[in-house]
Amino acid sequence: VNGDRYELVVTDRQTLLDVIRDEVGLKGTKRGCTTGACGVCTINDASGAAILSCLTHALEWDGEAITTIEGLEKDGRLDAIQQAFVEYGAVQCGFCTPGVI
């Protein structure tokens, strides 16, 4: 997760969202509709493809690299999309922003 390795005990009932938020402690990935429709739970795989973490079993990702909103900034600098959201005031209330980015 975001370049860090975690050794966790995960059940076959936990989603990737559950593990990211509840086990790893990263709260940027949000829990919304839990049906994949809203996109607030979106994270990226190693290729940059969007993954709906609320619909994905955590065990399927054992040993795989994923990136959450917290992993986008590098050396204290926001990534280009994050910076554009700030510059153009695209955040509104901000709840869904991590999934959109």
Language-model features, listed with the residues they occupy:
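Signature of N-terminal electron-transfer/Fe-S-associated modules in redox systems
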Residues: 1-101
